[in-house]
Amino acid sequence: MLRSLVGSEMCIRDRKKTCHHSERKEENIMLKDFTIANLLDLNETIAKDLFEGKTYPWEVLPEIGDFILKLGQTLSEEEYDHPSEDVWIAKSAKVAPTACINGPVIIGKEAEVRHCAFIRGKAIIGEGAVVGNSTELKNAVLFNKVQVPHYNYVGDAVLGYKSHMGAGSICSNVKSDKKLVVVKDGDEKIETGLKKFGAMLGDNVEVGCGSVLNPGTVIGRCCNIYPCLLYTSPSPRDS
């Protein structure tokens, strides 16, 4: 009987070791999920060149403003209005007269900027994207067909193709202790060197109403974040 119990205990320990090893392997795979290649379809943004040569999407954040100024100079006058020095708006886009738009900014074809939207600058709004009532954008790239339609804050963030933020969900971009943001995945850590870092959303991500994405949040493709969550941990694809 004693031998049987000891043997069972050893089996349990072995299983725990095996499970722990599997978890570590999964964590390493998850970290790869947060690269640009695994998060984003670069064919679904006018800002494709901004991401070239980089590994993680947050690496583009310090360069968005300068990139817009360079890219804007290359846009067709037949397709884009240029109402001020650092603002380009596609002629097919719909912009409410009550929207506040500060450059540098590019608003893509068929995009919609609704009543009282506030674009603070350094923003790229993709084709067919929606920036809604009282939504605020700052230093952000919205890929094509992104929707931030109701009372959202999107600062220092990248939102992948067809991602959607429910009403009142926000990207918190500064830690309360004002320290630099670190992306964590299990025991793995990546020092970003950034004080302001909102969220990185992969393609086809759904964020539920009223959720808060804390600084350094990275969400893999096709993930669903439930409503009213305070969310920090990275999410692998399809979770």
Feature-to-residue mapping (PLM):
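Flexible, glycine/small-residue-enriched loop-and-beta-strand segment within the central core
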Residues: G72, I101-I107, V113-V207, S211-L213
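Short, Lys/Arg-enriched N-terminal segments with co-localized hydrophobic residues
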Residues: E9, D14-I29
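Single conserved hydrophobic/aromatic residue that forms the stacking wall/gate
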Residues: M1-D14, Y231-S239
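Extended, small-residue-rich solenoid/repeat segments and analogous flexible loops
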Residues: L42-F118, K122
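C-terminal segments of enzyme domains that contribute to small-molecule binding surfaces
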Residues: F34-P62, L71, K175-N224, L230-S233, ...
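Short, small-hydrophobic-rich alpha-helical interface motif
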Residues: M10-I12, A93, A111, S163
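Short, intrinsically disordered, charge-balanced linker/junction segments flanking boundaries
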Residues: L2, K25-N28, C223, L230
